[in-house]
Amino acid sequence: MEMTLRWYGSKFDTVTLKQIRQIPGVTGVITTLYDTAPGEVWSRERIKEMKDEVEKSGLHVSGIESVNVHDAIKVGTSDRDKYIDNYIETLENLGKEDIHLVCYNFMPVFDWTRSELARKRPDGSTVLAYNQDDIDKIVPEKMFESISKDMNGTVMPGWEPERMEKVKELFEMYKDVDDEKLFENLKYFLERIMPVGCFLVSARYHAAAVSCVSHGRITVYPGILLKAAKCSIG
C-alpha cells in the first residue's frame, strides 16, 4: 500500500506539492489534467509536463483521477466511438509515460455529488459530506446553484461552470438513459478499452498497460461488472 494525496494542480489547488511532501509517509499524488476537456486526447507532452512538475518536488504521480468519460459515451450517441478512440489513445500515452493507474466514473450529468463541501467536525476541521435526504430536497436544475455557494473557488470535477451553464441541455441529453441503458453503454465502453485498460494486456498494448478503476458511486456491483465486461475484480 502506498500513501498518496489528491492534488488538483498548481493552478487549482491551494495546497502545494512542497506542503504535501512534508506529510509523513506520503510518497505520491493522485492528479489529472484539469484544464483538458472530456473527450480530448492527453498528449504525451502534457503528461510528461505534469509528471516533471510533480517529480521535481520529490513525489511521483501514483495515479490519475480522473480521465473523464465524455457524455456521448455514457448516453450512447452515434459519435461515441470517436471519443472512445481518444480515451484509448490517452490510456496508451499514460502507460508510455509510466503511469499505470487510472480512476474513472460513469456517473451521469453531475459526475460525483456531495450535499455539503464543508461540514464542520468536532475538532474544527471540515470534510465533504453526503446526505441523500438533503439531495432529495434540491431541484436538480438548481443543484449547482445550491452547492456552488460552498465551493470557495474550488472547481469540482464534472461541476465546471462552463458545463453547468448547459445543465438543462445535459438533462435533456440524458432523459432517455435509464439504469439499463447506462449499463449497456458501460459494457460497450469497457469492452472497447479492456485491451489497454482493464487488466487484460495484449501484445499491442503491453508497453502501455494501464489498470482502470471505476469510481464506487457508479453503483456497479461485482456481478454486473463481470457480466458486462468479463473483467476480474477483487
Which functions belong to the PLM regions below?
Residues 1-12:
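Boundary/entry segment of secreted carbohydrate-active catalytic domains
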Residues 11, 73-234:
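Active-site acidic/histidine proton-transfer and metal-coordination neighborhood
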Residues 17-25, 42-62, 92-96, 192-200, ...:
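Acidic (Asp/Glu)-rich catalytic clusters
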Residues 27-37:
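A short beta-strand-loop structural module common to alpha/beta enzyme folds
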Residues 28-30, 63, 103:
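Conserved beta-strand positions in the central sheet of alpha/beta enzyme cores
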Residues 34-35, 68, 108-109:
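Conserved beta-strand edge residues that scaffold enzyme active sites
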Residues 62-71, 77:
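Active-site-adjacent substrate/metal-binding segments within catalytic domains
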